[in-house]
Amino acid sequence: MACLSEGVSPSPISRIHRMATGLASVILLLATAHAAASGPSSTSQEKSTPKPCVAPEIDFGGNDLQGLDAYGAALEDLLKAEKFKELNCIADLQRSGKERFPGGMWKLHEYYWGITKLHGHPTHEDWEDRLKLAQRWVDATPESITARVVLAELYTGYAWDARGNDTSDSVTDSGWKLLSQRMEKAKTLLDQASALPAKCPEWYFAMQQVALGQGWDVARAEELLKRAVAFEPDYYYYYRQHAFYLMPQWNGEDGDASRFALQSADRIGGEAGDLLYFQIGAKIVCACDRPEFTRFSWPRLQKGYALLEKKYGVSVAQLNLVASMAVKFQDWAAADNAFQRIGDNCDKGTWMTETYFNQMKEVATQMGAQAARSNAILQEAATNLQSAGGAQYQKSVEQALLPFMRQCASSNNDRVQFELVVKVGKDGGAEDAWFRQPTAMAQCMMRAIYDSRVKKETPFPVPPRLDYWLDLHLDPASVSVAAAN
């Protein structure tokens, strides 16, 4: 399936995967504006007595995906009503409070997303109307860092809109020209904003979008990342955006993005590192042909998600990401578990189409029970190996398999290592077996073991207990080594 939103050109203002919000009816925003020291947004606010920021009550209705859309819509309504002071006040509050939604998403980042995201298929007039509103915001509150970052992110989105989502060789000369002009406009706005007394974590993220659009060299992009992380270490979007910048279709080579995720997570270390590893992976996974994601460690991604849910709470949007990751790694037990928790709440930002979501959900349902049984057997085999005498018994079974391997090696040239799971019965016969990699040698070994069972042979030593499972990692090269010995 083609990745419609990220496979060729990203929409840097867009958050690829929606994160969680509350599930109950909540007051979206009701707080007191902070004094100038916490991030002033306009001269008038600095000189006057702080007033409360009031926004309409939002009913999240039990679905965090819908709740997040409602959150963005409420902010968009304030923009259209030209409630610029209220918008500045809300942003100041979220900057200073560093609050997050369930699932770990920063409210500040969602604030910018809600205002700058144009839904559906926006026309040239739609972009121009939104840009004019943002420009009036800048004009009305010239000291607002928020207004300038919003306007800059709108220009980066408008720039990618001109380029389109096709491959680079299909972009018109006009498209390239508009991309360049609008990215330069965004950079100019951000440069101007950097001189303001108030600072904002989103400024660096917006500049990373410019870096991607203008094709900055790696050294320059890394320096920007370094400055961003120094300003706000926990604003994980910086790491995500840089990983995307390192994707092969942009400025990196195969393996660069996954290597960056690993190095970043290891440098931070501990649970925080594992959590960041998942957050970066969530940016790279896509319902498309993107091999880079499969270079990530699935066990570490799972660990990171578990920590994220424990720390920030459950999010249907996050569960959509976990299900997508599990599908990529063909861990159908994990996928089935995630789909059951998701229900019918498909996040199209993750799956691109509801049809694909339903297809994968059905596959996971069919394969999940079988995968869960397989996982339980593998765990039992691991326990057997660690038990008293387990390692010695497994070695004896591997030795007993050498004649089978020698027979198979004589009929094919496959020398790839493979994994074979075997259940040994009480008398030393093979009662069950399957391979985990469909190599030629593995398939030949399965036929040989099956023939042995049909003949009621007992090629293995009597196991320590009944129905004894082993997870065998076999190397065809051991056949020649054994022969030499």
Predicted regions and their residues:
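Compositionally biased, long intrinsically disordered regions
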Residues: 46-80, 86
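Short coil/linker segments at helix-helix boundaries
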Residues: 43, 69-73, 78, 85-143, ...
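Extended alpha-helical scaffolding segments
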Residues: 311-352
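C-terminal non-catalytic interaction modules
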Residues: 323, 361-376
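N-terminal secretory signal peptides that target proteins for export/translocation
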Residues: 1-17
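Charge-biased low-complexity segments
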Residues: 370-485
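Bacterial N-terminal signal peptides
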Residues: 20-33
